[in-house]
Amino acid sequence: MKKTLAALIVGAFAASAANAAVVYNNEGTNVELGGRLSIIAEQSNSTIKDQKQQHGALRNQSSRFHIKATHNFGDGFYAQGYLETRLVSAQSGTESDNFGHIITKYAYVTLGNKALGEVKLGRAKTIADGITSAEDKEYGVLNNSKYIPIDGNTVGYTFKGIDGLVLGANYLLAQERYKYTTAAAAGAAGAAGAVAGEVYPQKISNGVQVGAKYDANNIIAGIAYGRTNYREDIASPDLGKKQQVNGALSTLGYRFSDLGLLVSLDSGYAKTKNYKDKHEKSYFVSPGFQYELMEDTNVYGNFKYERDSVDQGKKTREQAVLFGVDHKLHKQVLTYIEGAYARTRTTESKKGVKTEKEKSVGVGLRVYF
């Protein structure tokens, strides 16, 4: 009998939990190790930055390793520590297979109670991360972090005491600061340069966000709002003038359980305040679907229309589409093929109209452990 989409999603969460190996379990303490190795073979073509040739690659696709330790105190109270690393390209060198360095993606501690919620401190995802519903494996056309940061150095609270409902709030702190004071900054007053401890230009100084998502009874609904402050670099305006972004993300979807079909509509809006410059407004809408074609095989896709505009200034419109098929060869082995196409049209009064195109297609394999 064909599984419903709801059962498929529940099964996916169960499989995800099963991927982690329990290496220690005694007296209320549980330690798990898990992760995945992911490889993708791809072909891409772009006219952005005057690129005119196609490029093929065989590379790492977000391979990762994590360790999670949970200590149960009793009466529903617990503490948890989580560390996740990723394989990425080296910052220097010419390697393009993305296996050059190991970095820390997430590292946080949690104190919680099953009925009261949990407090999370460290480098972690925020409530905005899980708001939109669109599915992708690699070429996601939604850029949610442009509207609200989806992770960072944060203090967060999450409440899951009501079945199907998640409520959350996060306070973001600066994560990228200068480590040293340069000679220019240490010299004459007003000289440009780096000062140890100061936030790096155009990086997050602080921010706050709240959100809620409901996922039950075949209905998906979510919304998040965030206000994020950035450090503008006054001495060197070429590095950027962004001061503050007020953004919102939302989703609305419905599961047709008997058909194995999920349809959704994601959207976002942001207003960017620039230092002594005109403000910028952005928004997007993105209808999408996920369909269980047969057991262990799923088809998914979404379309996005996005617009950025400055009063009496540059206007950018982007249309993008993504389509993919995945198949589970084994409960811990997933293969997929995914493609995306984006067309961006930029209009400036003195420069005319410029059109850029980008397309990518890839075949990937993930092995979980």
Swiss-Prot record:
Stored InterPro entries: Gram-neg_bact_OMP (IPR050298), Gram_neg_porin_domain (IPR033900), Porin_dom_sf (IPR023614)
Keywords in alphabetical order: Cell outer membrane, Ion transport, Membrane, Porin, Signal, Transmembrane, Transmembrane beta strand, Transport
Signal peptide: 1-20
Primary location group: membrane
One CC-aspect GO term: pore complex
Mode of membrane association: Multi-pass membrane protein
Domain of life per record: Bacteria
Protein location: Cell outer membrane
GO molecular function: porin activity
Entry annotated with the keyword Transport: yes
One GO biological process term: monoatomic ion transport
Function: Forms pores that allow passive diffusion of small molecules across the outer membrane.
Assembly description: Homotrimer.
Protein name, UniProt field: Outer membrane protein P2
Gene field: ompP2
